[in-house]
Amino acid sequence: MNKENKTHRAAVLRGMQALLVSATVLCTCGCKDWEGLVNNEKPFTIHSIVPSQLMANDTVTIKGIGFDDAIKVLFNQTEATIVSKSADAIKVVLPEMTNGSDALTEKIAVRVYSPTQYREKPYEMQFPNAIFTLENLKYKVDTLAHYPVGPGSYYTEIALSHEEFPLKVHFLTMNVRAEHLLFRPVLADDQLGNTERVIHMGPRKTAQGHGRYFAGVNGDFFNLGGDNRILDGMTLDGNVVALPTETGVGNMIVQKDGAVFIDELSYSKPQITIGGTVTPLDNINNKRANDQIVLYNHFYGATTQTDDTGTEVVVKPTEGAWALNANVAFEVVETHTAKGNTAIPEGCAVLSATGTKQAVLNALHAGDKGTFNIALAAASYNLSAPVHTLGVKPLILKDGKPTSYVWNERHPRTSLGLSADRSTLYMCVVDGRWRNVSAGVTTTQLALLMKRAGAATAFNLDGGGSSTMYAYNTGLDGTGLMNRPNGGTYTRKVANAFFAVADVKDDNRIAAIASAGYVIRVKQGESAALRFYGINAAGLIVDNDLKDVQLAVSPALGTIEGQTFKATGKQRYGTITATRQGVSAQIRVYVE
């Protein structure tokens, strides 16, 4: 959104410059002809309006020629107070106006009237807040934070003000094609059935030495209070972690080349083929029931956790590793009859059968060969061999439109989404159950928020007390907690999550600085302390309380003491420039 605003402002400035070159501005909308004017009144022209952007109650000067008979100035349909007037300049006070757009500036018409004619010129009026309409509710938008958190990745915090249903919304926006950026689901403690706090997953996975897990959100719904089983399926590194309990659920899909998709996935029934005989498997990584054959891998735990009533066979791939959408050749390593709880060696799997299904395994011996296959089919894309998938529920946003999958209750919510060209990934958490701060949203409202951010496709993840967003070295006391679950700081342990990973080495050298606050809002005569982050070349925050920053501000706006700004001037808005060792950042200031 910040980039869109900058692009919009640049286009506006170019347009204003083109208008300033023009000698006159032609009359429009009912302006009377030059000929036959009453009392021989001379035509007047508007050359420019300066400054180019101001806010309500600021003074603006309309420059031109022949204003002697001008008696009224309107901004859209609202009359402005004239401070002074001459033949070539009219000074007016901008009237109070309501922003009607989802932007900090809105193009309005400035009309200067004389007794018999008027001239009109477009003007970009600056507003302290944009206005966003969510279904039938109008919200005042305030961007509280916007800063980098990793390769091609930014965190944005937005407050949507409303008397009855205020909202606090958190976004992580990521350039999928950014260098050194990977995406990966995380299983709680790397084992099915466990739970773990999202804010602990990032540091734990980073400590394993496979990149910096710098940002993520909670994942799938799970059997809370029971066995904590994931409900909608998950795969990691070409291994099935858990099969979905429903078909055609929404999935975040990560391909080997790093491409990401959101689509509804269907799983074929897993099967093994031995000696030309195909045997369907009843489950993967689930408790074995009577007359079943089940495959277990290391995500289930160290052993199969079975009794001694069946047959178990340890198998390993003959080449490479386990994979999805492929016939994976395997070799029997060892067999166990009437013995359970078999250990699952690294890189291997265990086939376990009871009752009528035992015969298939009883016929096997060490060295025997076979193949394993499970196919994942997407509804809208031709998938090759996905590396990771995270299943959730059906899509809430598809092709830029909310779907019929709706939960109408307002709750804290979590969402994952992609832009239409799949170049931008969005993680979102909306706080809820937070009195007077954030009421939560329905799934349709969540879909519309994702669409406003830029997503064309999105789904709803586990919400309520599970909704958690993490970003490395920022947030609450540097813990990475970006939102406030149920309005507090307690984070629920969850079964899995989805993370962005920076495939870079540690580097504490500061290459850029960023303000923790996107906008400073302060009352006249009052002060506001500023906080800055040190950002390395990969976009990661390496110092979350940077002190050696020099600040500069126009005296017309206020004064600086250390890292504190005081609104002592008459100017109502402007910027503070922060500089450190040749790198700088700017912070908006609004004086109320």
Pin down the residues of each PLM region.
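Extracellular/luminal low-complexity segments enriched in Ser/Thr/Pro
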Residues: 92-97, 560-575
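Short flexible loop/turn segments that cap and initiate beta-strands
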Residues: 538-557
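Conserved, well-ordered active-site substructure
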Residues: 224-254, 387-420, 424-455, 466-511, ...
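Zymogen propeptides
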Residues: 33-40, 126-348
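A short beta-strand micro-motif common to beta-rich folds, especially ectodomain repeats
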Residues: 106-112, 571-580
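Beta-strand-rich structural segments
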Residues: 526-540, 576
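Ser/Thr/Pro-rich low-complexity tracts
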Residues: 31-135, 585, 589-591
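Low-complexity "stalk/linker" and mucin-like segments enriched in Ser/Thr/Pro/Ala/Gly
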Residues: 77-84, 552-564
